[in-house]
Amino acid sequence: MASATRQFARAATRATRNGFAIAPRQVIRQQGRRYYSSEPAQKSSSAWIWLTGAAVAGGAGYYFYGNSASSATAKVFNPSKEDYQKVYNEIAARLEEKDDYDDGSYGPVLVRLAWHASGTYDKETGTGGSNGATMRFAPESDHGANAGLAAARDFLQPVKEKFPWITYSDLWILAGVCAIQEMLGPAIPYRPGRSDRDVSGCTPDGRLPDASKRQDHLRGIFGRMGFNDQEIVALSGAHALGRCHTDRSGYSGPWTFSPTVLTNDYFRLLVEEKWQWKKWNGPAQYEDKSTKSLMMLPSDIALIEDKKFKPWVEKYAKDNDAFFKDFSNVVLRLFELGVPFAQGTENQRWTFKPTHQE
């Protein structure tokens, strides 16, 4: 049922993406929350031992050895675009099959995993970023900003086991790319080449945005990663997806009426709706005056209060194509932060075909 409802919502969004009007929608059902353990250790195989090898022009080489007496020669497997497309398709198939999560989709939490894995980058020290997948370990997995992301890591563990040659780092980012595209967002070019690190690579707490803060905080956090005002606003458009949970961030509710479809509705709602403080026992957040079913965070409202942020909000509210173009460009940059890609691969990114275009 959730899958059928999600498909209907996506079809309706395709037809009305340029004809948005703020009005009460069908009530979004809030699924029962599930609790997840961190992903299990990767199973070893009696037949193969996989080792990450040297980086090559299109990604990484993976060496494996047979354990039979007649197989003494190491072989190298260099995954191609087609191999990564198979991983993409597997993630997309699981997104369609596993519809027992928020609003019928794990898509938003996969985007959040990729975002939080990348958003720890510090341009001054060169630490953090999407290389390493260090959120597999405490203390990074226990950072408050990462609460609830075990759900995304557990969702991807069977994919990792089916394709053991892909690193967790590359898998998490590919999952973010897949989720954005499968939720009708823009194409996000992808470049493999990330390696996994151990617990020593965990980043310090406090590098991700704090939803309770406003414009100065946003500029400090995003500026550390190298983003300007326009890029901060474009990246914030990811809040069109998903919802907040009281047992994670403390906040509650979705930002938009279609939290499993990426559109510019987040910006339209910011500009066109009236927002008021929510009267409840939780942390300070806003609710829409019309239906009281949507929410905005203090960091969201900061985008329309700041005179330099607001023009970009207004631009994206009027032009979904402009938002998609800028969002794709800045997400590509975000997902590559901190990755020591092999020289000569700058223009060797791949774009994968979404399943809804097949």
Swiss-Prot record:
Reactions catalysed, as given in the entry: 2 Fe(II)-[cytochrome c] + H2O2 + 2 H(+) = 2 Fe(III)-[cytochrome c] + 2 H2O
PROSITE patterns: PEROXIDASE_1 (PS00435), PEROXIDASE_2 (PS00436), PEROXIDASE_4 (PS50873)
This protein's record includes keyword Metal-binding: yes
Site (Transition state stabilizer) location in chain: R112
UniProt region (Disordered), positions on chain: 194-213
Keywords: Heme, Iron, Metal-binding, Mitochondrion, Oxidoreductase, Peroxidase, Transit peptide
GO BP terms, alphabetized: cellular response to oxidative stress; hydrogen peroxide catabolic process; response to reactive oxygen species
UniProt cofactor note: Binds 1 heme b (iron(II)-protoporphyrin IX) group per subunit.
Primary location: mitochondrion
Compartments where located: Mitochondrion matrix; Mitochondrion intermembrane space
Cellular component terms (Gene Ontology): mitochondrial intermembrane space; mitochondrial matrix
Active site: H116 (proton acceptor), W255 (tryptophan radical intermediate)
An example molecular function term from Gene Ontology annotations: metal ion binding
EC number, UniProt record: 1.11.1.5
InterPro entries: Ccp1-like, Haem_peroxidase, Haem_peroxidase_sf, Peroxidase_I, Peroxidases_AS, Peroxidases_heam-ligand_BS
Keyword hit for Phosphoprotein: no
Cofactor: heme b
Record-listed heme b binding positions: H239
Segment annotated as transit peptide: 1-36
Homology family: Belongs to the peroxidase family. Cytochrome c peroxidase subfamily.
Protein purpose: Destroys radicals which are normally produced within the cells and which are toxic to biological systems.
Subunit note: Forms a one-to-one complex with cytochrome c.
Name assigned to this protein: Cytochrome c peroxidase, mitochondrial
Species lineage: Eukaryota, Fungi, Dikarya, Ascomycota, Pezizomycotina
Gene label: CCP1
